[in-house]
Amino acid sequence: MFQINCLNPISKVGLDRLTADYKVTDNMNDAEGVLVRSASMHELELPENLLAVARAGAGVNNIPLDKCAEKGIVVFNTPGANANGVKELVIAGMLLAARDVVGGIEWVKASKDNADIAKAAEKEKKKFAGTEVMGKKLGVIGLGAIGVKVANTAVSLGMEVYGYDPYVSVNAAWNLSRSVKHVTNVEEIYADCDYITIHVPLLDSTKGMINKEAISKMKDGVVLLNFARDLLANEADVLAALKSGKVARYVSDFPNPTTAGQPGCIVIPHLGASTEESEDNCAKMAVEEMMDYLENGNIRNSVNYPACDMGVCSQAGRIAIFHKNIANMLNQFTAVIGEKNINISDMTNKSRGEVAYTMLDIENAATQDLVESLQKIDGVFRVRVVK
């Protein structure tokens, strides 16, 4: 029986995927698996029995990845599960920036007691007139699951779309419309595009990437959209550019005191993935990834350990070893197992940066003596008996 703790409310559609071998517990200290959305785990004590953390969403800056890796705790996320929900809001944000619908709605609210509101509207509506997006140039920075969907939809709206991503995956490239023009220098997007939307992860290299220097290279009157991470934009620089007219609109899904209520800012209360469909998709994907790992040791969509899949174990035992990515580890593992007179029927070893993951199918059930012997090897973080 595996126990699962939910640090945030998780969609029932996802939790319903759990079989009778699972129990949801309110006590994290009893859990082998944790499901989380936005709750911060950085200050939490991670119990020794915790095996996996699954984030129902893409961003994982609320999870201590290195700490988990050192403890042999696999962290999963759900890339692409909420992509359509975010894409739709990005398109909505772009349309709201093109036409002052928000301002018009506020005028209607303020004029609700005017008996001649319809007549007044005909006079006032020119204040809220805008432009169409058809024929305009959109630059998409980051061609992951969301960026690709935004680019493809913008093409269908008649926009001229430019995409930039030096690390674009093969899968993303296959899904990208042929009408999207791929550029190799982000400054081409800065110089040419009327709208710029960013869809990159928050890293040291991307933090504050939309700053005074970048904005100075953009077209006058550019519209900036940020539905990825709040810290990707230096919002003080963005506000200065709004005041000067260099930036026409800044659309963000991340409310904060800097931009809330500021002229030219359209700030949405983090609704990108807040659809029933997105929450259901993320929950299902997170639960399925966690179940496959807990039951079989397979790793899919982890952000701190390499992908690894050996299917369902057909042998008497399966062992998973978390260790440093250094030389001679495999030789030591096989030597210890051989000394116990146990035959290895299948094995795989994968690495990611400074850590590695080894799974071994053995023809005898793993004993406590074997586990302790493997655990004593220098460089091993954790030994887990999967079966």
Stretches with model-predicted labels:
Residues M1-T78, N211-E213, V223, N234, ...:
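An N-terminal-biased, well-structured beta-alpha scaffold segment characteristic
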Residues H42-L44, P166-A260, S274:
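Rossmann-like adenosine-cofactor binding region
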Residues P79-K137, N301-V303:
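Phosphate-binding beta-alpha-beta segment of Rossmann-like dinucleotide-binding domains, i.e.
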Residues K87-E106, A154-M159, M285-N298, T334-G338:
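Oxidoreductase and adenylate-handling cofactor-binding alpha/beta cores
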Residues G147-V148:
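N-terminal Rossmann-fold NAD(P) dinucleotide-binding loop
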Residues Y250, P263, L271-K387:
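NAD(P)-dependent dehydrogenase/reductase Rossmann-like domain
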